[in-house]
Amino acid sequence: MNRDWSWGFNQFGTIRRCNLIIEKSQASTGLSDADKKALVAEGKMLRAMTYYYIAKHCGRVIWADHVLAETDEFNLPLTESIDKTYDLILKDIDDAIAGLPETSLQGRINANAARALKSEVCLTAAAYSTDDTRKKSLFEQAVAAVDGIQGYTLDSNYGSMFNQDGARTSPEIILAQYYSKDNTNGAGTLMQEMLPNQSNKRLEDYGGRPFFNQDLVFECWLEHSPSQNLVDDYLVIDQITNQGVKWNESTQFVNNTTPLSNADVADMAVDAKELDDNSLAYQTNSNAPDVQINDFMYKNRDQRFYHSIQYDSCMFYNELITLHKGGNLHRTAVDGKTPGNGYIPITNYIWRKYIYVNAERIFWNNPTDYHYVIFRYGRALLNKAEALLGLAQYDASKVSSAVATFNRTRTTHGNLPPSIATSLADAWHDYKIERHVDLALEGDYYWSLLRWGMYGGEANHGKPAGDIIPELSSPATFVEISQDRHRMFVGTVGY
């Protein structure tokens, strides 16, 4: 943070608008008492959301609880501690819960949204507190907040929550921000930076295949793509044991492939640095044309994988997406040698989550409806599971309750067998995977890693509280699949 970059601290224009809502509503002579109560509560909820954003970045904040006038003292102090910051935020949330209606129009805040926010704020507050009694109370408050949510259920069609199908009908969405095609184009949404840019002319020049049925069906400005690190956490159902395991640990993968050395796949790498001590490489045991390593990697996955990720040989927008060497959207599919060049995915994966399937392609000036999910019941349940894992430090019986709670999203969203974890360490392991995949692309993982690092212990690989977080020290990885789909390796992304 410096004079040119606020690192999220400078939200005071937003805070002023929240305070205006509160004060103008309270002073109104035209509003009913019921309307005043609801609007004041809405203002406090918005203020809490804004300060939570600042607190996650900075810890201590400058708390402004009224509209500042020109004659006011502007040399306001920081909160004396992080604990005090979260006390103020939680007070606003509790006031909001008391004043908000239980139900509301879509896109409008209600008391259940405030409870969902409280559950997550309590987790973060507990992570940054050194008071053991306070931590326990915060975990208990998080559980109670989620238990208080009424009228929402998990959506068995996970992907629909994030596209046109379930935007306004999903039983899981508590609060979302909606955009209308009347005043929204592709460039005004995340889709513009999540989809690639490729033409049949470029495919012809580079030698990639197959051609697209609709030329330029993908003509966006891709800025980021899912990493293999994320894909690793979408578990596979082992066809012998019926347990959820990592893709390269399943019986069907182990029995049909052979590990390779880096030297065995060096010809597939664009740069020798892509292969290192952490690389994985395999080949199929059979060279028959109808045997492909993709089948052993991508079949029988957590269902959220198919709703979230475009991968080699999947269909999207009525197009066959090929991300193997020589594929139409392979990481070098512009010039055959430069990964990620020309808005092509550098990891050989593309986002599917949060992509609408419209009659017209996603394009910068094509109108589109859109929405962002802010609070949903599944996320709240995962917050409850984490709070129960926190309480397991004081009461070991909470482990089974935590596992039962995160198994609800694991089985309903992922169609996976339930976790059978019984120890606190195993429960944390399975919970972290579950949160990673269920909340992918929802602005959660980085902040969760920080929180788990501050908890320490089983939440961060047995390390002391505040120690190094291994996931933040690990390089991003990609997958490379040979043109005949008999070999593959996982390599390190070069920047």
Locate predicted features.
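Short coil/turn linking the two alpha-helices of tandem helical-hairpin repeats
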Residues: 29, 55-62, 104, 121-133, ...
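Long, intrinsically disordered, low-complexity segments
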Residues: 11-12, 88, 162-249, 326, ...
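C-terminal substrate/ligand-recognition segments
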Residues: 2-5, 279-411
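An aromatic- and glycine-enriched ligand-binding surface/loop that stacks and positions planar moieties
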Residues: 112-115, 120-331, 459
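Conserved, well-structured interaction surfaces
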Residues: 1-58, 74-87, 91-106, 251, ...
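Alpha-helical solenoid repeat scaffolds, predominantly canonical TPR units
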Residues: 17, 21, 85, 92, ...
